[in-house]
């Protein structure tokens, strides 16, 4: 009777799972997001988790334009933190926000209108258009953020245009005003002629070239201010003594020369103080020249330029600049020249010499032209010396008629000319015509531009509203010191900014924003800004929104019977200025954290780009410290900026912009623009050191996608290998596991600890490195490789197989949750494909993995690294034999092995029966001594021989026992035993 052939392939237990090999992210991720939304996973966890409330307060992005990869970096970082906190059992409260007021949106809605059309718009017209634009942008950006996989209260975001938010902001303003921190005054501020409004420091940018060097070029000039008189007689006497031998007109008449220097005669020889400025257009506003009282100044002579006074330290440098040779006649301390009078080169007025610590010898002449209406340091000097303020420039950056007042004869007219173009040229021409121009040259340097119009700004003195930072600066610095800053350098950065900043200009001359709730008496122009008046406006805005300010008259907004405290008048007009948008967003701790149920401040975390040290971090700090005496945050985390793969800024002109939508959903040409999905983008975020600038581009994303693929394939193999495993039935106790199994669980416990520490310390790149190494080195290249024999060949319910499955189960359960904060879609997809029942509908309901401290096995750790290194040596030898065509599969080989390390020799002897599985060969022999022709390299010798015996049809191992079993003549002894359920 002929025996029916057995199909042994059917007895091999290969992995089986319906978890797809390909992610199909563009469709599968959307399905998973729909599942989360339909099941209400985020909302349920946020409400029902047993832990404390965790608040990461969202810094509001601007509701203007499409999202770029920098937005993705920011929101994904926040989501990683929030998802980890949810898995830890905390009740996360994440309210997304948008900054909706301000100039960029106003300009956007006006850009397509003609000047005539713009002039017809009322403030309410502008506001309606701006509001509609902002709300449309919010809807668009909201959808994109959700597609990134970001969880939050998307149905109830905060918008700075919401009436309840605006009312809270007015409350902050009112508290600051009542404490005396808000005032109105004339000061130089950053002014944008292109936008016709004051700007905060955070609304400026400083253009750079691709190499990071400044991209702005100014026309700098060296100018002579003729000396009229010396203030100090002692100085005049010394100067006269040194000058007398050189002046034939005063031969032997020293007393007369002294009198001339003191201004008591009109025959003073031509002496001038030389100044240098990069803003010639500010010279019509000059009211003084500043020296440093502690610097030495030299009176020098040259054939080309006569007698000049410059910093002694700069004489040689200036001689080169002016292409001349200087002879030093006398030197004086700057303080000895204080109060001396100079003639303005263009106007019939004098400019006194004043002293200022800001004057240095780093550049220029050591003498600084001082225009109090065009610089903060100049303004402070003017206050000290009672110089007054002159700023003959209008809102559009053009000279006013005041710029021509007392102008010397035969000089060009300045009025009406733009100070940054033809006005600047006119001043330079006037200096030349007056004989005061020593030199003009181009000067490349940092220069502030309007962040939205991308055009240069100016310093201009105007009447504005200010927050007096100096009044609460010490408290702000103390609050900074009590905050955790990540990276730590952030503390030094914001400390220096707050310590050195001027008062905060909070008013803007536009329509789209929250009004400054001040009124002016029609009779005496006195300002009305009281608790009663602010609360009345606040109440109206809370109900009707800030449009009410433009819809109602002052009398309709103010409480009945209110009167001017100065004159008793009862008629008032409204302030026209609105608040700085940084005051808007800087009040979010009050408008969101202080108003919504279960929210509070200080928040646990603020996280934004490093530019927000001068922006939102600072404005939030100042408003909160001023009103509450504390910082609004406990921890502040900053990230850098996204650059292309070559470290360049992204721009459409360079064609190097990375569009997150294109990364996620792909392009028309999928080969050129693959649909990577949100998780690959998220994995990139976790892979970089976000505290510095990050590189991203096609090759970077391709590398990240490969890491994602390896993690996914690892998970797929784990799922497939557990297709017949029921944890409640099949789990093997730790003590009953084999040593390699215990070692792998030890490694899992270490990975669990390292990943937890990475998330706790916000060092997400450590997560990336740890998970990548675990999936590749520990699992794919080691444990999963050596476990295939047990999983495929052994009897289904054997201890050998169930032990391995127990480890895979533990790994899958932990790994899925460990990756969930960064790769939520992949983690959820794995969870939904678990081959055994789970009570948790979502991986996020399962919580963070439990720390199994009993898995930590130091003894096992000491043994296995040496074995793994030896395994690598064996693999190298096998690969060499394979390349030499001596073997095909490693199972065709027998290994003879000798090591010189006694401890490792003992370990090999102890593990002798398991070595064939460790090396994936058919036989292993340990040699006490080596043949003479074999040498030891790096402490070991590996000899590759042909395996003994015949190839088993079922497991493909070679064995001398193949054919011994009559029922299964083509099988080895292991497979015969496995089919009988005994191996």
Swiss-Prot record:
<dbReference type="InterPro" id="IPR001412">
    <property type="entry name" value="aa-tRNA-synth_I_CS"/>
</dbReference>
<dbReference type="GO" id="GO:0002161">
    <property type="term" value="F:aminoacyl-tRNA deacylase activity"/>
</dbReference>
<dbReference type="InterPro" id="IPR010663">
    <property type="entry name" value="Znf_FPG/IleRS"/>
</dbReference>
<dbReference type="Pfam" id="PF06827">
    <property type="entry name" value="zf-FPG_IleRS"/>
</dbReference>
<dbReference type="InterPro" id="IPR002300">
    <property type="entry name" value="aa-tRNA-synth_Ia"/>
</dbReference>
<dbReference type="GO" id="GO:0006412">
    <property type="term" value="P:translation"/>
</dbReference>
<keyword id="KW-0030">Aminoacyl-tRNA synthetase</keyword>
<dbReference type="InterPro" id="IPR014729">
    <property type="entry name" value="Rossmann-like_a/b/a_fold"/>
</dbReference>
<keyword id="KW-0547">Nucleotide-binding</keyword>
<dbReference type="Pfam" id="PF08264">
    <property type="entry name" value="Anticodon_1"/>
</dbReference>
<protein>
    <recommendedName>
        <fullName>Isoleucine--tRNA ligase</fullName>
        <ecNumber>6.1.1.5</ecNumber>
    </recommendedName>
</protein>
<keyword id="KW-0479">Metal-binding</keyword>
<dbReference type="InterPro" id="IPR050081">
    <property type="entry name" value="Ile-tRNA_ligase"/>
</dbReference>
<comment type="subunit">
    <text>Monomer.</text>
</comment>
<dbReference type="GO" id="GO:0008270">
    <property type="term" value="F:zinc ion binding"/>
</dbReference>
<keyword id="KW-0862">Zinc</keyword>
<comment type="function">
    <text>Catalyzes the attachment of isoleucine to tRNA(Ile). As IleRS can inadvertently accommodate and process structurally similar amino acids such as valine, to avoid such errors it has two additional distinct tRNA(Ile)-dependent editing activities. One activity is designated as 'pretransfer' editing and involves the hydrolysis of activated Val-AMP. The other activity is designated 'posttransfer' editing and involves deacylation of mischarged Val-tRNA(Ile).</text>
</comment>
<feature type="binding site">
    <location>
        <position position="608"/>
    </location>
    <ligand>
        <name>L-isoleucyl-5'-AMP</name>
    </ligand>
</feature>
<keyword id="KW-0436">Ligase</keyword>
<dbReference type="InterPro" id="IPR013155">
    <property type="entry name" value="M/V/L/I-tRNA-synth_anticd-bd"/>
</dbReference>
<feature type="short sequence motif" description="'KMSKS' region">
    <location>
        <begin position="649"/>
        <end position="653"/>
    </location>
</feature>
<feature type="binding site">
    <location>
        <position position="972"/>
    </location>
    <ligand>
        <name>Zn(2+)</name>
    </ligand>
</feature>
<comment type="similarity">
    <text>Belongs to the class-I aminoacyl-tRNA synthetase family. IleS type 1 subfamily.</text>
</comment>
<feature type="binding site">
    <location>
        <position position="975"/>
    </location>
    <ligand>
        <name>Zn(2+)</name>
    </ligand>
</feature>
<keyword id="KW-0648">Protein biosynthesis</keyword>
<dbReference type="InterPro" id="IPR002301">
    <property type="entry name" value="Ile-tRNA-ligase"/>
</dbReference>
<feature type="short sequence motif" description="'HIGH' region">
    <location>
        <begin position="61"/>
        <end position="71"/>
    </location>
</feature>
<feature type="binding site">
    <location>
        <position position="955"/>
    </location>
    <ligand>
        <name>Zn(2+)</name>
    </ligand>
</feature>
<dbReference type="InterPro" id="IPR033708">
    <property type="entry name" value="Anticodon_Ile_BEm"/>
</dbReference>
<feature type="binding site">
    <location>
        <position position="952"/>
    </location>
    <ligand>
        <name>Zn(2+)</name>
    </ligand>
</feature>
<feature type="binding site">
    <location>
        <position position="652"/>
    </location>
    <ligand>
        <name>ATP</name>
    </ligand>
</feature>
<dbReference type="GO" id="GO:0000049">
    <property type="term" value="F:tRNA binding"/>
</dbReference>
<dbReference type="Pfam" id="PF00133">
    <property type="entry name" value="tRNA-synt_1"/>
</dbReference>
<dbReference type="GO" id="GO:0005737">
    <property type="term" value="C:cytoplasm"/>
</dbReference>
<keyword id="KW-0067">ATP-binding</keyword>
<dbReference type="InterPro" id="IPR023585">
    <property type="entry name" value="Ile-tRNA-ligase_type1"/>
</dbReference>
<dbReference type="InterPro" id="IPR009080">
    <property type="entry name" value="tRNAsynth_Ia_anticodon-bd"/>
</dbReference>
<dbReference type="InterPro" id="IPR009008">
    <property type="entry name" value="Val/Leu/Ile-tRNA-synth_edit"/>
</dbReference>
<keyword id="KW-0963">Cytoplasm</keyword>
<dbReference type="GO" id="GO:0006428">
    <property type="term" value="P:isoleucyl-tRNA aminoacylation"/>
</dbReference>
<dbReference type="GO" id="GO:0004822">
    <property type="term" value="F:isoleucine-tRNA ligase activity"/>
</dbReference>
<dbReference type="GO" id="GO:0005524">
    <property type="term" value="F:ATP binding"/>
</dbReference>
